Amino acid sequence: MPQGDAHVTIAVDGGNPQHYTGIGYHDHNWGNISMLKLMHDWYWARGKIAEYTLIASYITAERQYGSKTFPIFMLAKDGKVIADDATKVRFSMRDVAIEPDTGKPVAHQVIYEYIDGPERYVLTFTREKDILHNKFIEDLHGIKVILARLLRVDGAYLRFTGELSLEHYKADQLVETRRDEALWELMYFGHVTRK
């Protein structure tokens, strides 16, 4: 469900209930093997800009699977899917630097470009704030920490907020530009490749 209506009531420690409404998102991981064994890293994002809704991901497989990449992309306008063919997606990153807390390479900009004949959409996520750095080993305790260190567990999860811009081109003519805030993540199971 890329976008649904959310109605939430929260009461903390028996206090007065607080009521909130907004948009909600739900996804589900599926498969019969651990993602840790299959995936090296991925960028994942969702966003809403005016009448557009976006879900985008770029997955890199582990080295034993050839480090192959898999884009996932869906762009809808007014609830109707207008772009969802992964073979038409080009993914790129700008200003990649090592994030000091996790040691993972993080892009300042993540760009998904969707080209379908004369139609082209460019969606650019520009990182403004890191809202979460989670090193997986820090969630472990006791003997599990020792085992994780022996196995060289090095995974991290990072979440960012910033601006999402959408540019729509027809035959190389810019016909529409939209901007809004967005949330996206980098899940980095694997080790950073040293050059």
Model-derived regions: residue spans:
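Structured soluble/peripheral alpha/beta segments that form catalytic or ligand/cofactor-binding pockets
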Residues: 1-195
